[in-house]
Swiss-Prot record:
Pfam families: RNA_pol_A_bac, RNA_pol_A_CTD, RNA_pol_L. Keywords: DNA-directed RNA polymerase, Nucleotidyltransferase, Transcription, Transferase. GO terms for cellular component: cytoplasm; DNA-directed RNA polymerase complex. InterPro entries: DNA-dir_RNA_pol_insert, DNA-dir_RNA_pol_RpoA/D/Rpb3, DNA-dir_RpoA, RBP11-like, RNAP_asu_C, RNApol_insert_sf. Belongs to the RNA polymerase alpha chain family. Its EC number is 2.7.7.6. Residues 241-312 are annotated as: Alpha C-terminal domain (alpha-CTD). The N-terminal domain is essential for RNAP assembly and basal transcription, whereas the C-terminal domain is involved in interaction with transcriptional regulators and with upstream promoter elements. This is DNA-directed RNA polymerase subunit alpha. The keyword Transcription applies. In cyanobacteria the RNAP catalytic core is composed of 2 alpha, 1 beta, 1 beta', 1 gamma and 1 omega subunit. When a sigma factor is associated with the core the holoenzyme is formed, which can initiate transcription. DNA-dependent RNA polymerase catalyzes the transcription of DNA into RNA using the four ribonucleoside triphosphates as substrates.
Length: 312
């Protein structure tokens, strides 16, 4: 059974709350490090579930090219800032975060009020700057998903004129790199390898959890292959043995036994294999001596007939 160690040799949290971890996996046989690294990287980058802002509503705004009175950023800039929010939602439904801010103020992600199902990772992420005497009223729609989801112009939410859709990037892992290092020589002189895997997340998930989720996805993907059973193709029958194809003439039977079998439509050994000793005795003019002769001839080529017929 394959056995190896998994060590986390480095772990850091950046100022923007993104997290990075470095894992060393080994020892592995030659080629296994690349196999593991490639499969894990693909799942980590595109297969993990994450949380993203999918739509924004701004009071008094009905299209993305508008401006908000008293707000330094135009609507496009506000949408781009909302796209940078890093959130973690435990709900399967769409969650809504709201804020109402009076100027002067610098509006950040921490000003958004969500239910207890959603937490804001990068609370310092800027959203907008509101001047004195003005206000900004805004809500964001948050969903869980996998990969990248472009704006759906035909969706129900898109029909609402004041709800501005955003291309959603759900991927919680930002970057994955791996290298393969050769280590000591194993049994039989074969080279051994170690996989060095670096995982960088947006902070909504730890590198340890990301690695565990990716591994479980791969296990679920490969598990059905462990119980594959190949169905037989319909219509296929086992090929008859060479002995069963021997013609009756080659058994060197007596003339009496040969003629009786021929009259009973027995032309080869394969025809005889459907008979028992009792069946042979029922052939017209076929006595015990002829039956014994047939049994002996078949035994010489490795075939034996049952004494009595089988009953269902």
């Amino acid at each position: 059974m394959l056995q190896y160690q998994i060590d986390r040799v480095d772990y850091q949290i950046a100022d923007d709350q993104s997290q990075s971890g470095v894992f060393v996996i080994g020892p592995l046989d030659r080629g296994q490090a690349t196999t593991l690294g490639t499969a894990l990287r693909r799942v980590l980058m595109s297969g993990l579930e994450g949380t993203a802002v999918t739509a924004v509503r701004i009071a008094g705004v009905n299209h993305e090219y508008a401006t908000v009175p008293g707000v330094r950023e135009d609507v496009l800039d506000i949408l781009l800032n909302c796209k940078e929010l890093v959130l973690s939602s435990r709900s399967r439904d769409t969650e809504i975060g709201r804020l109402v801010v009076n100027g002067p103020a610098s509006v950040t992600a921490g000003d958004l009020q969500f239910s207890s199902q959603v937490s804001v990772v990068n609370a310092d992420c800027p959203i907008a700057t509101v001047a004195d005497g003005h206000a900004l009223e805004l809500e964001v729609h948050v969903e869980r998903g996998v990969g990248y989801r472009p704006v759906e112009r035909t969706s129900e939410d898109a029909a609402a004129l004041d709800l501005l859709q955003i291309d959603a990037v759900f991927m919680p892992v930002r970057r994955v790199n791996f290298t393969v290092d050769e280590t000591a020589v194993g049994e039989g002189g074969s080279a051994r390898e170690r996989l060095r895997l670096e995982i960088n997340t947006n902070g909504s998930i730890t590198p340890d959890d990301a690695l565990a989720y990716a591994a479980n996805q791969l296990i679920a993907l490969f598990q059905p292959l462990a119980t594959v059973t190949l169905a037989e193709e319909p219509g296929q029958e086992p090929e008859p043995s060479a002995e069963s194809q021997i013609p009756l003439e080659e058994l060197n039977l007596s003339v009496r036994a040969y003629n009786c079998l021929k009259r009973a439509q027995v032309n080869s050994v394969s025809d005889l294999m459907g008979f028992s000793y009792e069946d042979l005795l029922e052939i017209k003019n076929f006595g015990a001596k002829s039956a014994d002769e047939v049994i002996e001839a078949l035994e010489r080529i490795g075939i034996s007939l049952p004494q009595s017929r089988t009953t269902a």
